C-alpha cells in the first residue's frame, strides 16, 4: 500500500508511513488519552514534513524548468458553521457560570489533553508558519519535537470550548472545598445536637440527684421533729398524768374519810390509833376514838388542811401536761414544715431543670435545622456538580466534533495535494 501525489510524482510506501507513525509515538503507548493525542500529533507532523519536503523538491524542479507554479489556498471553515459553534460554546459558558465545577478527574484529564493539543488563532498561525519554514531541511527533528498544535485550530468557537475546559479545571478545587465545608458544617451541627442531648441528660440527672437529696434531708429532719413530739408526749404522760392520777385517787380517799365513810374502826384487839402515809412520804399517826363511831377532831382537821394542797398539785400536773402537748405540737409542726419545704425545694429544682432542658432543646432544634440546611445545601451542590459534569461532557463532545471536522479539512488538503 502506498500514498501517491499524482501531480508531483511522490510515492510514500506503507512501510515508510508506519515508520513515520511509530517515530511519533510516545513511550507510554496509548494508555492515556493525552499520550495517544500526542502520538497522533507527532505522526501528523512527521507526515506533513515528509510531504512538504518532497513537494518542495518537486516544486523547485518544476520552477527550474519554467513550468507554472500553482499555490493552493488554505481551506476556511464555513462562516455559518463557525457562527453556530460560537453560539454553542457561548451557551455552554453561560450554563457553566450557573453550575458548579466538575469533580470527575477523568473529565479534567480530557480537558488537559484538549488544551495541550490545541491553541488559539495566533498560536496556530505561528506554528503553521514555523512548520512551513522547517519543512525542507528539518524533517527528523520535526517528527520528534513537533509542537502539539494544529494549524486548522483557528475557530474561535473551538478556542472558547478550550477556555471553558480550563475554567472548569480551576473551579474543581473551589467546588471540593465548598463540599468539604458543607460536610463539616453538617458534622459540627450533628455533634452540637449530640452535645445538647448529653446536656439535657446531665441536667435531668443533676435535678434528680439534687431534688432527691433535698427531699431526703428535709424528710429526715421532719421525721426527727415528729419523733421529738412523740417523745415529749410520752414524757408528759409518764411524769404528769400518772402522778396526777395517783393524787386524784388519794384525794378522793381522803374526802371519803372526812365524810365518815370507810373510816377506821377498832379491832378486837382494841387498837387505839392508825397510821396514814401522806403523799410526801411522811407517816402521820392519828388516834381513834374508842367509840368507833367518828374520827377525832384532830384527824379531821389535818385531812381538811391537806385537801387544797393536793388539789393544787393535781391541777399543776394537768397544766404541765397541757404545756407538754403544746410543745409536742410545735415539734410536729416543724416536722411537717420541713417535709413540705423539702417538697417545695424539689419542685423548684425540677422547674429550674425543666427550664434548662427547654433551652437545651431549643438549641438542639437550631442545630438540627442547621444540619438539615447544610445537608440540603450539600445535596444541591452535588446536584449542581452533576449537571455541570453533564455540561462538561457536552462541551467535550462538541470539541471532539470540532476536531473531527478539522481532521476532515486536513484530509481534504491532502486530497488536493494528491490531485
From Swiss-Prot:
It holds the Pfam family IpaC_SipC. It comes from the Bacteria. Keywords: Secreted, Virulence. Its main location: secreted. Residues 71-94, 380-392 have a biased composition (Basic and acidic residues). The keyword Secreted applies. Residues 62-94, 338-402 are annotated as: Disordered. The keyword Secreted applies. It is found in: Secreted. GO terms for cellular component: extracellular region. Belongs to the SctB/SipC family. This is Effector protein BipC. It comes from Burkholderia pseudomallei (strain 1710b).
Amino acid at each position: 500500500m502506498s500514498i501517491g501525489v499524482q501531480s508531483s510524482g511522490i510515492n510514500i510506501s506503507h512501510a515508510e508511513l508506519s515508520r513515520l507513525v511509530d517515530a511519533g509515538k510516545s513511550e507510554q503507548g496509548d494508555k492515556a488519552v493525552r499520550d495517544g493525542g500526542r502520538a497522533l500529533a507527532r505522526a501528523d507532523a512527521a507526515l506533513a514534513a515528509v510531504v512538504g519536503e518532497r513537494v518542495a523538491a518537486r516544486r523547485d524542479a518544476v520552477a527550474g524548468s519554467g513550468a507554472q507554479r500553482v499555490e493552493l489556498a488554505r481551506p476556511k471553515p464555513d462562516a455559518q458553521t463557525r457562527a453556530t459553534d460560537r453560539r454553542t460554546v457561548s451557551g455552554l459558558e453561560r450554563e457553566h457560570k450557573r453550575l458548579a465545577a466538575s469533580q470527575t478527574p477523568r473529565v479534567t484529564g480530557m480537558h488537559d489533553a484538549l488544551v495541550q493539543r490545541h491553541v488559539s488563532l495566533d498560536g496556530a498561525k505561528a506554528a503553521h508558519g514555523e512548520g512551513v519554514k522547517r519543512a525542507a531541511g528539518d524533517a527528523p527533528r520535526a517528527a520528534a519535537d513537533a509542537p502539539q498544535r494544529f494549524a486548522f485550530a483557528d475557530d474561535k468557537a473551538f478556542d472558547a470550548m478550550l477556555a471553558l475546559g480550563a475554567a472548569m479545571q480551576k473551579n474543581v478545587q473551589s467546588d471540593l472545598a465548598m463540599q468539604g465545608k458543607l460536610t463539616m458544617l453538617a458534622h459540627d451541627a450533628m455533634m452540637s445536637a449530640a452535645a445538647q442531648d448529653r446536656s439535657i441528660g446531665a441536667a435531668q440527672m443533676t435535678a434528680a440527684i439534687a431534688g432527691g437529696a433535698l427531699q431526703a434531708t428535709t424528710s429526715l429532719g421532719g421525721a426527727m421533729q415528729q419523733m421529738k413530739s412523740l417523745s415529749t408526749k410520752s414524757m408528759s404522760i409518764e411524769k404528769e398524768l400518772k402522778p396526777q392520777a395517783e393524787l386524784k385517787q388519794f384525794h378522793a380517799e381522803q374526802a371519803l374519810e372526812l365524810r365518815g365513810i370507810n373510816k377506821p374502826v377498832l379491832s378486837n384487839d382494841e387498837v387505839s390509833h392508825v397510821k396514814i402515809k401522806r403523799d410526801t412520804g411522811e407517816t402521820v399517826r392519828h388516834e381513834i376514838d374508842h367509840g368507833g363511831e367518828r374520827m377525832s377532831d384532830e384527824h379531821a382537821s389535818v385531812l381538811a388542811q391537806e385537801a387544797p394542797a393536793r388539789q393544787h398539785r393535781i391541777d399543776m400536773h394537768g397544766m404541765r401536761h397541757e404545756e407538754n402537748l403544746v410543745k409536742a405540737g410545735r415539734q410536729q409542726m416543724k416536722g411537717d414544715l420541713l417535709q413540705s419545704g423539702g417538697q417545695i425545694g424539689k419542685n423548684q429544682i425540677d422547674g429550674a431543670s425543666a427550664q434548662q432542658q427547654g433551652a437545651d432543646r431549643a438549641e438542639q432544634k437550631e442545630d438540627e435545622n442547621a444540619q438539615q440546611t447544610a445537608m440540603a445545601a450539600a445535596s444541591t451542590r452535588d446536584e449542581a456538580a452533576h449537571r455541570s459534569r453533564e455540561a462538561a461532557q457536552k462541551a467535550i463532545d462538541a470539541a471532539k466534533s470540532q476536531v473531527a471536522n478539522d481532521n476532515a479539512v486536513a484530509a481534504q488538503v491532502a486530497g488536493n495535494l494528491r490531485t
